[in-house]
Amino acid sequence: VMLENVTGILRAFKVDGKPRYAWFEVAKAFASIGCDYVPICLHVNARNVGAAQNRPRYIMLGFEKKLFKRILSKGSLGAEGKKAFNKSLKFFENIQQGNVPSYDASFYYDLAKSHPIFNEWPFKDLNKNPFEGEPHIATVSDAIHDIRSPEGISQPSDYVKMINRLSPSLNTLSKYESGLPPNHKLRAHGARVKARFRLYQVMAKIANKPIVNNLKSYLKDPVNNPITDDLVSHLSSEQFLSMDGGFRSFSSKETLEKFLTPMQTKKQTQRALVADSPAPTALSIADDACHYDKEQLRTLTVREMARFQSFPDKFEFRSKVTTGGRMRQFEVPQYTQVGNAVPPLLGKALGKMCKEFLS
C-alpha cells in the first residue's frame, strides 16, 4: 500500500498536553495485528523528479510481510536500504508482540536532508531528474513562459516537451483549436488589482528582507509602520503600474505614499512568482499568486498551475473553474483538483520504485 500526505503530517499535535505525531501513529496502525504491513516512511519532493514546483510530500510504503522479507533477503538493497528495512522489521515485530515503540523521528528518511538512502536502489528513483544532460531544476519560466500571452504559444521549453511526452496516448505537440491548451482561460482584473500585482512583482525581486518587510507592514498598517528612506531609495528605480494604465517610478516619499495608499490590504498571502525558481508549494486557490511577467498582471490559469505539477497539456480538467460557499460541499473546482493532485512525475517515480520492489 502507499499513503501520500502533505509535510504537515510530520508536525506534532498535542493530546493531553503531550506531543503526538500523526505519521508515526499511522505507521503503527498499519503494522498492527490485522493490518500486518511493514512500513517504510519517506519525505520527498516533486522538484527532485523534475516538476517545476517545490512540493514536499510524505510517503509511506506498506509492505506485506512475506514480500518485505523476500526483498530483504535478495541482497539488492544497499547498506542504507538494509539498515532501513531491518529497522522497519524490528518496528513491525515489536508492535505484533504488543510492545509499542516510542516516537522515533529517524524512522522517516528525508530527501531534503540528503539522506543517503536516496542514492541507493530503488529509492534513487525519487532523486532522479528526468532532464537529459546536466542536472536541472525546472523553473516557473520553464513551465509557463510559452503560454504567457493570449495571442498563442511560443517555443516550448525542454520541460514542456518532456511533460508532453509523459503519456503518448494523451499527448502530442499539435496545435489546439484555440492555439492554446485547455484550462487556460486568462482572468481579467481591474486597474487597482493589476497595480497591486505589479507591486508584488517588484517585491518578489527584492532580496533585502528588511525592505520587503517595511513595505508589507506599511501596506497592512501605514499609521504604525511608516515608509523608510531606505525603502524609497530601493524602489526609486522600479516601474509601477499607475491607475491610468501607464508605468512610472517614484523618487520621493510623498509620491510613493500617495501611490501605495490604494494598495493597502490586510491580505498578506498573495505574491508574485519568481521566473527562475520553482513554483511555491501553496498553489491551490486562484488568488494565491500572480504571474511574474510585467505584461501579464493577472493570476494564474488552471493550466499554468497544472504545468508546474508536470501535467501534460492534453490532460483536461473538468468541473467548474472555481466555486465557493455551500457548493464546495458538492463540487471540486478545477483549481482545487490541481492543488490536491500528486504531480505525474512524482507518481511515475513512485510507481517505478514500487515496480522494482515487486520484480
Regions found by a protein language model. Name each.
Residues 40-42, 257-265:
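Short linear interaction motifs
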Residues 270-280, 290-330:
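FAD-binding beta-loop-beta segment adjacent to the flavin cofactor pocket
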Residues 271-276, 280-289, 335-355:
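C-terminal substrate/ligand-recognition segments
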Residues 51-54, 261-263, 273-276:
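A short catalytic or substrate-binding loop motif that flags glycine-/basic-rich loops and adjacent residues
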Residues 319-333, 346, 350-359:
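S-adenosyl-L-methionine
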